[in-house]
Amino acid sequence: MKSGCGYLPSRSISRGRVFTVAKHLQRAGYCHGICTGEGLEIVGQGDCVIVQWDANSNGIWDREPVKESDQIGFRLKEHVLETLRGATSCEDKGWDKVTNPDAIIIDTFQVVRQDVSGFSPVLTVNMRAASKSEPQTVVDASYSVTGFNL
């Protein structure tokens, strides 16, 4: 196993980010009341996703204040994974970088929904990342969850 600075950080960062996105997907659609709209929106080829869930169990998907909104988005833009609390569109302004483009290059970020008749959908997050200092060091990470609330 390589111990160079490009290998372990990219591996742990990739897996950690994939797990974080997957946990948000697992919550998608939860509502302790009557919420309107879709709990999960997968855009494009799955390189952008917007998730809604009733985080405070007040029966609605809150949009305000933005810092406490029940929406969160993740997208791949210019080889960087970004996130935005309160996202309503993949084109919104103000997205924050989740990965450092000076250290990690994200080649692939994709969310895939697999619907199975009679069951909750399976949601899979796939990511491929490379160390900027060691581009030959590539890490593939994937994590699947069940969308029980969708």
Name each region found by the language model.
Residues 1-27:
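Aliphatic-rich helix starts adjacent to a transmembrane/signal segment
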Residues 12-13, 66, 137:
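Generic detector of ordered secondary-structure context
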Residues 27-36:
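Short, well-structured beta-strand/strand-turn elements
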Residues 31, 80-84, 137-142:
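Secretory-pathway extracellular proteins and peptide precursors enriched for disulfide-bonded cysteines
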Residues 35-116:
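Type IV pilin-like appendage domain
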Residues 95, 100-101, 108-150:
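Short linear sequence signals and composition-biased patches located at protein termini or domain-edge surfaces
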